[in-house]
Every structure is written in structure tokens, then in C-alpha cells.
Amino acid sequence: QAVLSETGGGDTASCDEYLYQELAYVK
């Protein structure tokens, strides 16, 4: 979860794309 929170500080577009990959990795 800490990684996801840090990702929120990035750009919106990049954040969403990175978040999607991160969530997929978590699952």
C-alpha cells in the first residue's frame, strides 16, 4: 500500500497507468 500512496504523487496519467500495473501486481 505504501508504494501505491507514493505513486499518487506522480502525474495523473502516469499515476493511473502505473497504479493499474501496481494493482495487477498486488493481485
From Swiss-Prot:
Activity is stimulated by zinc ions, potassium ions and DTT. Activity is inhibited by manganese and chloride ions. It is an enzyme of class 3 (hydrolase). Keywords: Carbohydrate metabolism, Cellulose degradation, Glycosidase, Hydrolase, Polysaccharide degradation. It catalyses: Endohydrolysis of (1->4)-beta-D-glucosidic linkages in cellulose, lichenin and cereal beta-D-glucans. It comes from the Eukaryota. One of its GO terms (molecular function) is cellulase activity. Optimum pH is 4.8. Active from pH 4 to 5. Activity is significantly reduced at pH 6 and is not observed at pH 7. One of its GO terms (biological process) is cellulose catabolic process. Its EC number is 3.2.1.4. Optimum temperature is 70 degrees Celsius. Thermostable. Highly stable at 50, 60 and 70 degrees Celsius. The active site is at E6 (nucleophile). Belongs to the glycosyl hydrolase 5 (cellulase A) family. Endoglucanase (EG) that cleaves the internal beta-1,4-glucosidic bonds in cellulose. This is Endoglucanase gh5. It comes from Fomes meliae.
